[in-house]
Amino acid sequence: MGQIPMPGGWSMAAMWLPVCGQSWLGAAAGFIGMWAAMMVPMMLPLAVAPLLNYRATLAGEGKAFLLTAIAGLAWAATWMASGLPVYLAGAAVARALLAMPALARMMPVLAAVAGVAGAAWHLAAWRRRPLHPGLPGPPVCAAALRHGACLGAHCVRRCSGLTVALLAAGIMERSTMVCAVVLVAAESVRLRER
C-alpha cells in the first residue's frame, strides 16, 4: 500500500484516496474488499460462541447447520458493510488533511489521542456489554439472516473502540494488526468462559 508524505514528517496511507485514473467508487470498492478480507477473519473468533449457541437452539432441526451457516454469512456481510462508513470517514479526513497542512501537522498527536481513547473505551465497555442479542423466533431462513445481521451489528458496535484504535494506529501496520488479533482472541476466550 502506497504512502503519501504529509506535513509534520509522517505519511498517510494512499488507500483513502483514488489513485490516478480510479474513480471514488472504485477506491471505495477496493477498500471494502480489503476491509472484508481483513476484518471478517480477525473478528470471526467473536462470532463463534454466539453462532454455536444459535446452533444449539436449533438442535433437532434438520436444517440447523444450514441456518447457522446463513446466520454466519449475514454476520460477515454486516462486517463488510461496516467498511463503507469507515471508508467515507477516512476519505473525508484524508481530503481535509491534504487541504489543511496545519491540521496535517497535528495529526500524529490527534491519532495518538484517538487511539488511546478508542482502546480505553473498548476495554472499559468489555465487561458491561451483553454476550449476544436474544435468539430469533421460528427456524427459517429469514430468521437466520436477521439473527446473523443482529449478531454482526452487535459485534460491530462492540468493537467500535478497537476499530478506532486500529485506524488511528495505522490499519495496515503489521504490529497494529498483531495487537488487534491478540486482543480479539483474548476477548473471544473470555466470552466463551462466561
Question: What are these language model-derived features?
Answer:
Residues 23, 31-76:
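Juxtamembrane transmembrane-helix termini in multi-pass membrane transport proteins
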